[in-house]
């Protein structure tokens, strides 16, 4: 339940900020534009911080399947709990998107003229810029998630100045501002399969149809799902190989 609420908050703040910024560019929605790409970065950063604050006391505070799988691989998180965590995370993404969509339903209708297209689907799920190749999309998500997991491991490393639960959300806030400002433009920096798949599933049911899944040869599975999972695995390998001094790592040869 904590992972569900954490991801729901993440999407409410992140997708909500995206809706306000993009939809307000239409004069029929708002008399003036309300924000910029930085506003969207802040929305996702506030979402990850509040999601972590709410969930850390009751769960591990992963609110990201890539983090959950990474922690199971490198820090002994029980594999038997992974499916339940991921289910809660994806459901949280679905519900968070549904709530934001309900809040901005009329604005979306005005912006789209009654139709449902990628222009507003991208407010909830990630879609790469047209010039990006398949390999470039994969690498962008892989790199961003590797960085995310390296920092996440460091923040929880007792041998490397681990933060208390109270400070962890603030550190994640700074991290997400940085990820958005440096690696967010080209693919929308999903770095979290639940934050993309949950809202994408909702979009398919809310009138956007199968186009959200058919986009760029099933982009939805290999860029915002597979790439983050593998990116977290690579980040964990690098951290445990070169930095980690604990005895609970599967990398024993150091």
Curated annotation (Swiss-Prot):
Belongs to the MIP/aquaporin (TC 1.A.8) family. This is Aquaporin-5. InterPro entries: Aquaporin-like, MIP, MIP/Aquaporin, MIP_CS. The chain crosses the membrane at residues 4-24, 37-57, 82-102, 135-155, 161-181, 219-239. Aquaporins contain two tandem repeats each containing three membrane-spanning domains and a pore-forming loop with the signature motif Asn-Pro-Ala (NPA). It is found in: Membrane. The keyword Transmembrane applies. A motif (NPA 2) lies at residues 192-194. A motif (NPA 1) lies at residues 64-66. It catalyses: H2O(in) = H2O(out). It is a multi-pass membrane protein. The lineage of its organism: Eukaryota, Fungi, Dikarya, Basidiomycota, Agaricomycotina. GO terms for cellular component: plasma membrane. It comes from Laccaria bicolor (Bicoloured deceiver). Induction: Expression does not significantly increase during development of the basidiocarp.
């Amino acid at each position: 339940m904590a992972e569900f609420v954490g991801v729901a908050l993440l999407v409410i703040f992140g997708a909500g900020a995206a809706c306000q910024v993009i939809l307000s560019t239409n004069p029929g929605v708002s008399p003036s534009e309300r924000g910029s790409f930085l506003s969207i970065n802040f929305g996702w950063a506030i979402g990850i911080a509040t999601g972590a604050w709410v969930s850390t006391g009751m769960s591990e505070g992963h609110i990201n399947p890539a983090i959950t799988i990474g922690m199971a691989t490198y820090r002994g998180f029980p594999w038997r709990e992974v499916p339940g965590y991921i289910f809660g995370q994806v459901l949280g993404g679905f519900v968070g998107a549904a709530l934001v969509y309900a809040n901005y339903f009329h604005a979306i209708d005005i912006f789209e003229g009654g139709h449902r297209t990628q222009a507003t689907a991208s407010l909830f799920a990630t879609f790469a810029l047209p010039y990006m190749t398949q390999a470039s999309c994969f690498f962008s998500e892989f790199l961003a998630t590797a960085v995310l997991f390296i920092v996440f491991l460091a923040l929880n490393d007792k041998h490397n100045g681990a933060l208390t639960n109270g400070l962890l959300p603030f550190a994640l806030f700074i991290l997400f501002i940085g990820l958005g400002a440096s690696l967010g433009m080209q693919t929308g920096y999903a770095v979290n399969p639940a934050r993309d798949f949950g809202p994408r599933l909702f979009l398919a049911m809310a009138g956007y149809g199968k186009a959200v899944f058919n986009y760029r040869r099933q982009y939805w599975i290999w860029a915002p799902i597979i790439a983050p999972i593998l990116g977290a695995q690579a980040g964990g390998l690098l951290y445990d190989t070169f930095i980690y001094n604990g005895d609970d790592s599967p990398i024993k040869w150091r």
